[in-house]
Amino acid sequence: MTIGIVVFPGSNCDRDVHWATQGCLGMSTRFLWHESTDLNGLEAVVLPGGFSYGDYLRCGAIARFAPVLSSLLEFVNKGGKVLGICNGFQILTELGLLPGALTRNQELHFICDTVPLLISSQRTQWFKNYNQSKNIFLPIAHGEGRYQCSESILKKLQDEDSIALKYKNNPNGSINDIAAITNKSGNVLGMMPHPERAADKDIGGIDGIKILQALLSN
């Protein structure tokens, strides 16, 4: 089973994801250039962090038109797993696979830190193997990570148990402390924290490993 890692012009976390999945966990991976439309043979796809297309106009606004994402819509509809990390989460909202939007941080500056997170839902495979009573610690690095949505969308996320992670100490002003959400089916996860930067105990802890392992779990 193989994971596809999408590479956009301006991406800078695709190699990090490759190292965490293949280098640390021994998973088979394949880089997908943004112009590719062939997702055959893939179990899951990762949209990594970075600054796709320089984040001009708005984070993820240009990336959403990449040819690879047309194929991604069909991939998701067939049940394929998709993980969007940071800029990847922004792209998923622009694409309409996840509701809401990511906006400028409340204090209007870039945040780079390791933060405690609360597992808000174990409904999906992504977080089933975590102890919900314990915080996990993952790095964040973003200037536009403040999750925003309407009250009706927030209620829907709550009713569907789709809020996956919450910040314990909200660093960016996200509504309801939201750090990660899933779609109703649970096969799409968007998150601002970086699990790939917490997959090696020597360089940042291992709290992200189980999220990455879920890419290939049934």
Swiss-Prot record:
- The catalytic activity of this protein is classed by the Enzyme Commission as 6.3.5.3, 3.5.1.2
Q: Give the catalytic activity.
A: N(2)-formyl-N(1)-(5-phospho-beta-D-ribosyl)glycinamide + L-glutamine + ATP + H2O = 2-formamido-N(1)-(5-O-phospho-beta-D-ribosyl)acetamidine + L-glutamate + ADP + phosphate + H(+); L-glutamine + H2O = L-glutamate + NH4(+)
The subcellular localization recorded is:
Cytoplasm
InterPro entries, A to Z:
Class_I_gatase-like (IPR029062), PRibForGlyAmidine_synth_PurQ (IPR010075)
Main location group = cytoplasm
Domain of life of the native organism: Bacteria
Pathway recorded for this protein: Purine metabolism; IMP biosynthesis via de novo pathway; 5-amino-1-(5-phospho-D-ribosyl)imidazole from N(2)-formyl-N(1)-(5-phospho-D-ribosyl)glycinamide: step 1/2
Any single GO molecular-function term of the entry would be: phosphoribosylformylglycinamidine synthase activity
Domain called Glutamine amidotransferase type-1: residue spans: 2-218
Q: One GO CC term of this entry?
A: cytoplasm
Task: Tell me which Gene Ontology terms the entry assigns under biological process.
Answer: 'de novo' IMP biosynthetic process
> Catalytic site residues?
C86 (nucleophile), H194, E196
**Which SMART domains does the entry link to?**
GATase_5
One short Pfam name that applies is: GATase_5
Q: Which UniProt keywords apply?
A: ATP-binding, Cytoplasm, Glutamine amidotransferase, Hydrolase, Ligase, Nucleotide-binding, Purine biosynthesis
Q: What does this protein do?
A: Part of the phosphoribosylformylglycinamidine synthase complex involved in the purines biosynthetic pathway. Catalyzes the ATP-dependent conversion of formylglycinamide ribonucleotide (FGAR) and glutamine to yield formylglycinamidine ribonucleotide (FGAM) and glutamate. The FGAM synthase complex is composed of three subunits. PurQ produces an ammonia molecule by converting glutamine to glutamate. PurL transfers the ammonia molecule to FGAR to form FGAM in an ATP-dependent manner.
Q: Which HAMAP family match?
A: PurQ
- What is the annotated quaternary arrangement, including any partners? Part of the FGAM synthase complex composed of 1 PurL, 1 PurQ and 2 PurS subunits.
Name the UniProt record assigns to this protein: Phosphoribosylformylglycinamidine synthase subunit PurQ
Q: Gene name, please?
A: purQ
